[in-house]
Amino acid sequence: MTIPNSIPITPELVASHGLKPEEYDRILQLIGREPTFTELGIFSAMWNEHCSYKSSKRWLRTLPTTGARVIQGPGENAGVVDIDDGDCVVFKMESHNHPSYIEPYQGAATGVGGILRDVFTMGARPIAAMNALRFGAPDHPKTRHLVSGVVAGVGGYGNAFGVPTVGGEVEFDERYNGNILVNAFAAGLAKSDAIFLSEAKGVGLPVVYLGAKTGRDGVGGATMASAEFDESIEEKRPTVQVGDPFTEKCLLEACLELMKTGAVIAIQDMGAAGLTCSAVEMGAKGDLGIELDLDTVPVREENMTAYEMMLSESQERMLMVLEPSKEEVAKAIFVKWGLDFAIVGKTTDDLRFRILHQGEEVANLPIKDLGDQAPEYDRPWRESDKRGPLPANLVDEPADYRAAILSLVGSANQSSRRWVYEQYDTLIQGNSLQLPGGDAGVVRVENHPTKALAFSSDVTPRYVEADPFEGGKQAVAECWRNITATGAEPLAATDNLNFGNPEKPEIMGQLVEAIKGIGEACRALDFPIVSGNVSLYNETNGVAILPTPTIAGVGLLPDWSRMAKIGGAQDGDHVLLIGTDGTHLGSSIYLRDLLGRTDGPAPEVDLHAERRNGDFIRSAIRNGQVTACHDISSGGLGIALAEMAMASAKGLTIDLSESRGPAHALLFGEDQARYVVTVPADLANFICANAEGAGVPFRRLGKVGGDALVIDGVCTIAVEELRNTHESWFPNFMDGKAETLAAAQ
């Protein structure tokens, strides 16, 4: 269907483009006339939440974004952090939530493709990927179909492109029944003096289109990603993009080759809102206008209109400002890789965004008002209600501790994710040192004998719902802790803030308070936010998701031969708890999964204790004093011990007699800033003395050996039984076995 440019602009048409009446009035005021249909589409794309961050920008500015190692913070395609020796790591996390619910395979695949492009647009070769996935209740009729499609899409794209998936999360909760979350992370390596930015420079320079041809897929995708869902959701399927990882691999190689020639003045990938967003961002950042001639855009469908070409989200495309003298060199590279190379416009000095099509000017708009001066809102918000304390003595103990531990390790949310990550290529490129299933993924830095990078992605949405401020702090602290548990120094983070409708003050309040908590934790832990993404309107029929501010972080290991793993325990090692005894059962999985309760406050995050305990752990690991390390998070000490026993295939004999408090709080309390370590017997006294000297709380828990987890006076479980229970839930669920669904309920 061909859409003419002269469609009358009605209030219904404006509303269907996601623009509020007052926003349309502002457009009329800005341009002094009624917009053309193409112009309406451009405003709709650039002024939606997905591109403008209009509800969150005010609060995002409060986050710490600088640090001794930060080369490039937010505002570019990805963040850039120095890792010494002239190397840097380039990384970002981004959501592809709405498309993945509508079309799970392509939605997830193009989410991976988009984040990889963000990284190599900066001049970095991708070396690692992660994904944080949230699905509805296991017994919801759509959940299994969505899990299957999303996991296949993530694997299908990442594996074919050739990047290892080294970590991530998969969780289930009924609050995601109508809106799943697909948060994709990628990191790449570059030289610190060879980073490419998107800010256009110079007047009259060619604007070049690179990559795959433009089709009608994804038209209006950014607008869809900024709206709530309702019953008409199936009609939105055409707004999901289609990805081709082989084309993207060629685009990566062509771009990196091109970047060595000096031809690139500025470069931007085409993601949300396609050609519109990339051209506007490049021009607005450089205080330049952009003129495009759509007759020169490579297309793969006939009779495409200006509206469709400007808003198509076809994948594997880039836009760049070219050094004119290098045109032939640049073109030859793209022809060699079988990709399109077309000069589609030029930079101008008039700050206008002009679009020509078939000899007609179809758009002429002020570029700054579309880009960095788009509307910004200070939406009303209110603080979340505070939950009262929930002392452990008011929470029932399990009748059978053995059954309780087995039930948790074999539950929907605590069971092994092997079924998922075995569909991902975790070893491609040959540098993976730690694979999914531990605290953090670790990848060796190519061409360096000892250096490696650690990656983790974390958030506990039930904590954020209970207390957005503490939950925001906890997401940062757990990510920092997981990186620390390998022995790496946490360098910086990227955030992916997934929330409901910001026009509701209680939802806006969750976002504001979570950002405040994230900011406080990042400052206390020297863990700046260097890139990120906000996904709002994750609601269906007025029901919002759990607030989910995902934090993904990167850490540096100067010598990977000294790193710690969750499964390194040796017979005869001593088991130590670093941190305080467990006390906190509010908002815990023990409470939720065994007692069916979701009450109680989130655990408090003492950032001073996090820093002190984490620095102590890292130092002990780097000094070669630790054989295995695991942070304590969901499920508390009991689940951490079970996971260590399974990972090392060794028994643990644990004595809680020195610990203070009821056994269910000691074993299932989710107090923060805690680790379990195993240490050689001859170093145990030395490490305990060091902890005492550093003011770090610790407990001697027991020893490694045998083939069972023995918690003295509480329970005994064979490691083999733990592992069978842990490994069976996911495959049984995906096979549709009824007892798995019953257990999940």
Curated annotation (Swiss-Prot):
Its EC number is 6.3.5.3. CDD domains: PurL_repeat1, PurL_repeat2. The active site is at residues 50, 96. One of its GO terms (cellular component) is cytoplasm. Its main location: cytoplasm. Keywords: ATP-binding, Cytoplasm, Ligase, Magnesium, Metal-binding, Nucleotide-binding, Purine biosynthesis. InterPro entries: PRibForGlyAmidine_synth_PurL, PurL_linker, PurM-like_C_dom, PurM-like_C_sf, PurM-like_N, PurM-like_N_sf. Substrate binds at residues 95-98, 117, 241, 313-315, 535. Gene3D superfamilies: PurM-like C-terminal domain, PurM-like, N-terminal domain. One of its GO terms (molecular function) is phosphoribosylformylglycinamidine synthase activity. It is found in: Cytoplasm. Monomer. Part of the FGAM synthase complex composed of 1 PurL, 1 PurQ and 2 PurS subunits. This is Phosphoribosylformylglycinamidine synthase subunit PurL. It comes from Allorhizobium ampelinum (strain ATCC BAA-846 / DSM 112012 / S4).
